[in-house]
Amino acid sequence: MAAAKAEFTEHGLAGARLNRIAINAKASKERLYSYFESKERLFEAVVAQWISDAPYQVPLSAEDVPGYVAGLFDNIVADPQGARLQRWIELEAPDGMFDNHLLRRIFQAKLDEVRRGQQCGLIDPAWDPKSLLMLLIDIAYSMAASGFSIDRIVGEPLSERTLADRRNAAAEAARRLVGVS
């Protein structure tokens, strides 16, 4: 599974090649096909393992939405390979992949918590819960992952201070976003 995760993280579902996975896993391509049936099924297995193993399952509490975003930020910084895999999932997940899937249950629980927060007056009810959740996730991702690219473009080394500032900015953006007007 490690070879498959590395391949999908690097190339996505469309660009991944079972022959490279087989070589890196020291297995035969035929054996992979016999076990997983298709590249899509192998991708689904990699995603399922990553979701169940990942510390990415940061709990969302309506009482501490900034803490949720800060926790996501921390996990993205700690596991850039997982963050990259998440983006490939968003871009290339096959139709039906999430039927009865752990990821669906995780996100449904987060949406339920957003709705609870809206009902309790902790989160601005003007937001569509799905749109708000996507924004919160993308704030964490943008500040954690995209910032690395900006630092490289402008030729500045990434410091602990910069990471702390970005984490704080992400949490503050979340606080302002959910504020009740």
Where are these regions (language model features)?
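Short coil/turn segments at alpha/beta junctions that flank glycine-rich nucleotide-binding fingerprints
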Residues: 10-14, 79, 120
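C-terminal peripheral helix-coil segments that are non-catalytic and often amphipathic
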Residues: 74-78, 108, 112-120, 138-139, ...
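Helical hydrophobic small-molecule/effector-binding pocket
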Residues: 66-90, 95-98, 137-148, 179-180
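Amphipathic alpha-helical linker/stalk segments
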Residues: 10, 44-71
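Amphipathic alpha-helical packing segments from all-alpha helical-bundle domains
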Residues: 55, 59, 95-120, 130-134
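Helix-turn-helix
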Residues: 3-41, 45
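Ligand-binding pocket scaffold of soluble enzyme catalytic domains
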Residues: 19-20, 35, 39-40, 49-54, ...
